[in-house]
Amino acid sequence: MVGTFYRAPSPESPNYADVGTEVGPETVVCIIEAMKVMNEIKAEARGIVTQALVENGKPVEFGQPLFKIRPL
């Protein structure tokens, strides 16, 4: 396990990226917590989020896809 996947900065905050959200290379889409450090993860491509592939609070591995993004 690399870390824990979080869709929002806190439980009370809205998700960084939901289905239908337009994202680009500078858009933060989630946070991965590793060793008590919160790492902002940015989209790797420009497009529209079509699916979140990981549930909030679940462990993730290096290289694991987190979202499906339809290119614009």
Task: Identify the meaning behind each predicted range.
Residues M1-L72:
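Structured functional modules or segments
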